[in-house]
Each structure stands twice: as structure tokens, then as C-alpha cells.
């Protein structure tokens, strides 16, 4: 495809347009008086959101070069969201300001590479100061952080605080939709481990990139699976039962993985596979723990057990399994509670007789996973649109609270960034020329989150920042007062701020040092059938035989390659059957 190229200032200005387009839509979502963004959906009702990452992902710009800028800043939001779970709007605001200030200076003759060095030096200074100002999160502050992160919603803050208190910070907390109008907290058996799906083709929710299985059957084995021949009998039983199916194995690869993916995508099986967690003997122990939790029999080579002998009675079960690219969460049924408690007691006895401190720590980790359980936050609302909105807020708040427990908190409302901005003056004055300018770009950007929080609350951002610097107090956008934000419980997770800073400087510096922007030239839309000079009938499509499905594994009825539809009349694709045995 032909490419459109922009050079030098022209390329950077086009990229800046894309950055501004996205950032201006995103930054209305920051602070306790943030505004909502309504997003049209192709199907169903529109979404109403107050989440920077969600807004950024939905934006496409007609100009292909400007759209590159939009995608760069969307990358900032998504990367911060992925790493910290929150802080996407802060990262977007910081990036926009750095890009704007950087391009002004480049247009005035500044060297982009020197600006980049100055920005990176400024970032290193800021991160050091941020770490020194961070304080550990005490138990009473958890609800405050959760409430602030939920936009001041005290109900959400209270529910998350209760969930954290019950399952602890190491426990599993999941958010799901409820059939009722009320948002409730439910504690059940379950656990999570750090392994994701074997293939992204198992994903059931494309927007969230998550695979969810309701009431699945579970095969657990310490064997490596590279062919499905031995699994044919149990797969046939699963297909007849119509149950979702999870395979948890040492590894699943090659022909076995390919065949599962093909049958998943053709609708023959609702299946997913996950590699077993940990390594060596600890992997086997972890599989035994999961087997007890789910009521499964561990199919182990040590016991001379083979996969071709597996029956439906050897499989485990769960209420729900949620799999992301790097994590699996199991919500178990209550009928295994006694077995789990017995397993925990056995592990506690092992701790007492184990001399190795390292082994004791590993066993205690297993105890925490088994005993912690799963906290289910069931989100209730009057409408589907409100439920989606509320669920997003709870997920953001939960992620921010976990981040706060990991690395501590600092004064919120952007106050800490303003204080560090003042400290940057000393570093700036000892630097020279464009290096100093790069540091000042970071310095100015640190003021922007507070300015936007104030603006969204109906105040003048410049005036608010000046008052914060004069009074040495933070600005409470809810009350419009200047006060000690730590005493008021307005706290930001240090991890969220750190990652927002790192991601924003990274993308802004790359954009400022860009000399050429290249994008595909959009192809003109094809003329509609029956248009001027065309055949009014629009042409007849070629007729073809329906495609024949691929061959599946022997003995597996209905399993195999999906059929490929033949060519037909315009708008009428040929029907293709799934491969028959």
C-alpha cells in the first residue's frame, strides 16, 4: 500500500494534533468533579465512562498521521493501565503538556536529543523525590484510597476496604455483574495463580482480553500434552455434556493446542488451556492444591495414570474461571471447603517440621492462596449502562488500592507533584542550555494534573496552583478548600504516580525526537454497485461449492477444522459445515 510521509516539524505538528485530540477528550475524566464521556457502540446502548484508557482506545482520527499521534498517547494510557491499573488520565495529561512544551522549544531551535536527555534527568530526580515522600498505607487508609480512586464514592470505598480486610492484600478480589440493584460483597472458596491462557484465541471477551468460563469442568495433569489422541474419549464426553472445559497441564503445545483453538473458534468446544504454575516439585504441589480446591483427581505420571483413561468423574469443577494473559482466577464451590481446610492444616504442620526458611516461605505462600479465598464484588445497577460504568469505577479503585498497598501513598490532588516541581528548580539552574529546557518541560508538566482537577471542578487552575505553592497546602476539589490532604484522606498511590511519570516521559521523548512520520494512504471507497457507468444489477457473484471441513482427530465426532464457505451471490456467502469425522 502507498505511504504518506511527513518530515521534521510537519510530522511532529501532525502527531501533536492527534495527541491533543485524545488528551482533550480524556482529561475531563480526572478528579472528584470529573465529567463523563459517552461512547457510541455498534451494537446495544452507548457506554458512559469516566476512564481515560477506555476513552483513548475508542478514538480514531481520519488524518492518518494525526492518528499515529493518537495511538501513541493511547499507548501511554493502556501501558499505565496494564502496569498500575489506574492513573491513565494523569499519564495522558502529563504527556500532552510535555509534547506541547517540547515542540514549542524545538520550533525555537532546541535540539530534540538534548531535550530528551534533560527530560530523562528530570524524571530520575522526580522519582527519587517521589519515593522519599511516600508513606506506607495503614489499615484505616485503605478505605480512603479506595474512595478517592472511585471518584469520591464512599459505598465503593467501603466495599473494597471490607474485601481487603477479609481476604487480605494477597487474596483474590474479583468484580462481576449482579442480577440485583444492589452492589454486594460475597466471600467464597477460590484462588489465583500467575499463569495465563496458552493462546489468545481462547479469549471470550475481546475488549477486556479475558477468557471467562462459567461452571466449567477441569482436567488437571502434570503431563505435557502435544497430541490430543489420548484425550479423545474425555473430549467427546465434554462435547456431549456441553460444559465449558479447562485443561491445566505442565504444558500444551503443537498439534494439541492448534486443534483446541480450531474447535474453540468453530464452536465445537468451549475450551481453554493454561500451563501449570511454578516448576519442578513445587509445580506438582501447586497442582495438588488446585485439584483439592476443585474436587479433581490429579492425573499424574508418578501414579502411572494416563490421559486416555480419564473419565468425567476425574474432572474438577468451579463456579467460574477467569483467565487473563498472565493470571488465572478460580472461584470454587463451597462443597470442597472441608477438604481445603484439611489441606491447609496439613501444610501448617509441614511448616513446623521444615527447617529451611525458604521452604517455609513457599509453603506459607500456598497456605495464603488456599485459605485466603475469593472476594466477589457483585455490581448492581438499574440499567446495563450504569452497571458497566459502576463496574469500571470499582475495577479502577481496586487496582489503585492494591498499588497503594504495594508502594505506599503520597498526598493526592497533584499536591506532591507540585512540591517536586518546586524542587526541580535547583536541578534546572545547575544545568545548561537545552538540557535545562528539557528539565523545565518536566517541571511544567507536573503542574498540569492539579490544574485540570481544578478546572473540572469549576476553578481556575493557574490560581489554584499558585495558592497551593503559597499556602503549602493541597486543594480539595470536593470542598473547594485548601487543606492538609493527608489528614483529609486524599491520597494517591505512589506506584500509580510513578508509572504515569515513567510512561509519559517515555512516549513524549520518543515523539519529540521523531523526524519522519509514515502512514498508509487511505484507499478511496469502492463505487457502489449500480453506480454511474456500472451494471445496474451490480454483477452476479460466482457460485461455488460449500467448503469441506478439515479432518479432526480420530473418533472425535464434530471435532475438526471449521469449514470454509464457498462463493455465492453478493451478500450471500456459501455455508460451510465444521469438519466431520
Swiss-Prot record:
Pfam families: Cpn60_TCP1
Segment forming the signal sequence: none
One Gene Ontology cellular component: cytoplasm
E.C. designation(s): 5.6.1.7
Predominant location: cytoplasm
Entries under InterPro entries matching the protein: Chaperonin_Cpn60_CS (IPR018370), Cpn60/GroEL (IPR001844), Cpn60/GroEL/TCP-1 (IPR002423), GroEL-like_apical_dom_sf (IPR027409), GROEL-like_equatorial_sf (IPR027413), TCP-1-like_intermed_sf (IPR027410)
Chain intervals for the UniProt region annotation (Disordered): 523-542
Superkingdom to which the source organism belongs: Bacteria
Keyword Transport tagged: no
Recorded GO MF terms: ATP binding; ATP-dependent protein folding chaperone; isomerase activity; unfolded protein binding
Catalysis performed (reactions): ATP + H2O + a folded polypeptide = ADP + phosphate + an unfolded polypeptide
Task of the protein: Together with its co-chaperonin GroES, plays an essential role in assisting protein folding. The GroEL-GroES system forms a nano-cage that allows encapsulation of the non-native substrate proteins and provides a physical environment optimized to promote and accelerate protein folding.
Subunit (UniProt): Forms a cylinder of 14 subunits composed of two heptameric rings stacked back-to-back. Interacts with the co-chaperonin GroES.
Record NCBIfam families: GroEL, PRK00013.1, PRK12849.1, PRK12850.1, PRK12851.1
Name listed for the protein in its UniProt record: Chaperonin GroEL 1
Amino acid at each position: 500500500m502507498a505511504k504518506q510521509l511527513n518530515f521534521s516539524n510537519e510530522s511532529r505538528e501532525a502527531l501533536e494534533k492527534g495527541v491533543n485530540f485524545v488528551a482533550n477528550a480524556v482529561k475531563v475524566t480526572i478528579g472528584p468533579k470529573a465529567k463523563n464521556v459517552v461512547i457510541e457502540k455498534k451494537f446495544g446502548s452507548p457506554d458512559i465512562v469516566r476512564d481515560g484508557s477506555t476513552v483513548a482506545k475508542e478514538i480514531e482520527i481520519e488524518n492518518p498521521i494525526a492518528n499515529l499521534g493518537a495511538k501513541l498517547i493511547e499507548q501511554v494510557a493502556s501501558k499505565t493501565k496494564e502496569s498500575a491499573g489506574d492513573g491513565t488520565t494523569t499519564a495522558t495529561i502529563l504527556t500532552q503538556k510535555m509534547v506541547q512544551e517540547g515542540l514549542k522549544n524545538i520550533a525555537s531551535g532546541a535540539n530534540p536529543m538534548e531535550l530528551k536527555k534533560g527530560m530523562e534527568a528530570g524524571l530520575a530526580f522526580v522519582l527519587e523525590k517521589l519515593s522519599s515522600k511516600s508513606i506506607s498505607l495503614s489499615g484505616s487508609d485503605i478505605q480512603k484510597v479506595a474512595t478517592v480512586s472511585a471518584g469520591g464514592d464512599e459505598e465503593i470505598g467501603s466495599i473494597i476496604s471490607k474485601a481487603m480486610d477479609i481476604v487480605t492484600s494477597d487474596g483474590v478480589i474479583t468484580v462481576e455483574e449482579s442480577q440485583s440493584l444492589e452492589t454486594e460483597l460475597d466471600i467464597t472458596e477460590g484462588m489465583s495463580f500467575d499463569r495465563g491462557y496458552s493462546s489468545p484465541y481462547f479469549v471470550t471477551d475481546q475488549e477486556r482480553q479475558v477468557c471467562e468460563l462459567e461452571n466449567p469442568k477441569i482436567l488437571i495433569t502434570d503431563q505435557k500434552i502435544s497430541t490430543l489422541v489420548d484425550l479423545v474419549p474425555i473430549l467427546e464426553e465434554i462435547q456431549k455434556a456441553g460444559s465449558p472445559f479447562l485443561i491445566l497441564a505442565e504444558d500444551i503445545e503443537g498439534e494439541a493446542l492448534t486443534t483446541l483453538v480450531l474447535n474453540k473458534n468453530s464452536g465445537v468446544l468451549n475450551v481453554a488451556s493454561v500451563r501449570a504454575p511454578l516448576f519442578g516439585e513445587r509445580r506438582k504441589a501447586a497442582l495438588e492444591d488446585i485439584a483439592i480446591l476443585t474436587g479433581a483427581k490429579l492425573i499424574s505420571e508418578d501414579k502411572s495414570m494416563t490421559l486416555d483413561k480419564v473419565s468425567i468423574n476425574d474432572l474438577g469443577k468451579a463456579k467460574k474461571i477467569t483467565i487473563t494473559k498472565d493470571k488465572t482466577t478460580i472461584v470454587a464451590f463451597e462443597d470442597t471447603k472441608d477438604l481445603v481446610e484439611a489441606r491447609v492444616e496439613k501444610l501448617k504442620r509441614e511448616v513446623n517440621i521444615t527447617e529451611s526458611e525458604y521452604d517455609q516461605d513457599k509453603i506459607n505462600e500456598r497456605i495464603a492462596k488456599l485459605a485466603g479465598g475469593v472476594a466477589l464484588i457483585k455490581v448492581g445497577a438499574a440499567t446495563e449502562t450504569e452497571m458497566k460504568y459502576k463496574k469500571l469505577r470499582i475495577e479502577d479503585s481496586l487496582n489503585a488500592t492494591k498499588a497503594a498497598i504495594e508502594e505506599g501513598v503520597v498526598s493526592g490532588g497533584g499536591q506532591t507533584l507540585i512540591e517536586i516541581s518546586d524542587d526541580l528548580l535547583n536541578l534546572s539552574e545547575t544545568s545548561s542550555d537545552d538540557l535545562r529546557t528539557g528539565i523545565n518541560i518536566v517541571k511544567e508538566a507536573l503542574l498540569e494534573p492539579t490544574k485540570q482537577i481544578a478546572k473540572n471542578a469549576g476553578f481556575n487552575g493557574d490560581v489554584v496552583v499558585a495558592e497551593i505553592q503559597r499556602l503549602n497546602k493541597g486543594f480539595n476539589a470536593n470542598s473547594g478548600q485548601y487543606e492538609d490532604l493527608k489528614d483529609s484522606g486524599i491520597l494517591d498511590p505512589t506506584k500509580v504516580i510513578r508509572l504515569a511519570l515513567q510512561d509519559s516521559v517515555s512516549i513524549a521523548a520518543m515523539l519529540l525526537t521523531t523526524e519522519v512520520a509514515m502512514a498508509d494512504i487511505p484507499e478511496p471507497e469502492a463505487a457502489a454497485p449500480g453506480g454511474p457507468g456500472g451494471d445496474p444489477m451490480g454483477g452476479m457473484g460466482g457460485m461455488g461449492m460449500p467448503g469441506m471441513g478439515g479432518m479432526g482427530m480420530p473418533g472425535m465426532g464434530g471435532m475438526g477444522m471449521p469449514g470454509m464457505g464457498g462463493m455465492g451471490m453478493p451478500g450471500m456467502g456459501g455455508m460451510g459445515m465444521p469438519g466431520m469425522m
